[in-house]
Regions:
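Short, Lys/Arg-enriched N-terminal segment that forms or immediately precedes the first helix
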Residues: 10-25
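Short helix-coil-helix linker/hinge
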Residues: 25-33
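The DNA-contacting recognition helix of HTH DNA-binding domains
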Residues: 32, 57-58
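Helix-turn-helix DNA-binding helix
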Residues: 35, 60-61
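Short helix-to-turn junction characteristic of helix-turn-helix DNA-binding domains
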Residues: 36-43
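DNA major-groove recognition helix of helix-turn-helix
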Residues: 39, 64-65, 71
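Short alpha-helical "recognition helix" segments of helix-turn-helix
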Residues: 48-53, 60
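Short, Lys/Arg-enriched C-terminal cap helix and immediately downstream tail that follows
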Residues: 68-84
Length: 87
């Protein structure tokens, strides 16, 4: 998983259960949910994700970097505040 977090340092140290929650709360399309979970939770390679969703690996990388992660980060303050309050 270290490779994934070098790409997205803001997500470093986020546990899998919280990453799943971020993906769901971001209200992504089904294809984007599959891309996000495959890369950010399961650390799959871009080529494997692309084969699963019918895109090439550079398109998957671009989608993750420009649309999916920014959308997830837009719900981050709400989620992180709720998680802190629950502790």
């Amino acid at each position: 998983m270290a490779g994934v977090y070098r790409e997205f340092p803001a997500l470093d140290g986020v546990p899998a259960y919280m990453m799943a929650r971020l993906i769901l709360e971001a209200r992504l399309s089904p294809k984007d949910v599959q891309i996000a979970a495959s890369r950010l939770i399961w650390s799959m390679d871009y080529a494997d994700i692309g084969a699963a969703v019918g895109m090439d690996r550079s398109a998957v990388s671009e989608r993750l970097r420009t649309a999916i992660v920014p959308r997830m980060m837009s719900v981050w303050p709400w989620i992180s505040g709720e998680m802190i309050a629950a502790k």
